[in-house]
From Swiss-Prot:
Tissue distribution: Red blood cells.
Source taxon at top rank: Eukaryota
Function field: Involved in oxygen transport from the lung to the various peripheral tissues.
Quaternary structure, from the entry: Heterotetramer of two alpha chains and two beta chains.
Organism of this sequence: Anser indicus
Entry's family note: Belongs to the globin family.
UniProt protein name: Hemoglobin subunit beta
GO molecular function: haptoglobin binding; heme binding; metal ion binding; organic acid binding; oxygen binding; oxygen carrier activity; peroxidase activity
Amino acid sequence: VHWSAEEKQLITGLWGKVNVADCGAEALARLLIVYPWTQRFFSSFGNLSSPTAILGNPMVRAHGKKVLTSFGDAVKNLDNIKNTFAQLSELHCDKLHVDPENFRLLGDILIIVLAAHFAKEFTPDCQAAWQKLVRVVAHALARKYH
């Protein structure tokens, strides 16, 4: 994957302003609410019975932060995303058996969360760079499935 200097700047510039805990929690909560079938991968998280329960669930919040922290690893390693996510791909494929389509869904939700939090700064160019990033990350996470 080739990243232009502008794409790198748009990604790293916005990333520096992201509250990882809040945006991560919101992104994972939205995934579980909008795509309820994804909840089956989180049965150990306790009460996921309603949007209110999901939004208030501390395990959802903690895992959302963990997920978005790993996105930070992608931002730091734009030229080596495939290797950055090799172990996570193995874990999600071999041990957790997560449908790789869910990585794409979460990426799309992250775009929505970023747009909501950074409305003015999230220009079409910025969105395009981030859309490319979430696609590359989803592809890297799905790699062990092929």
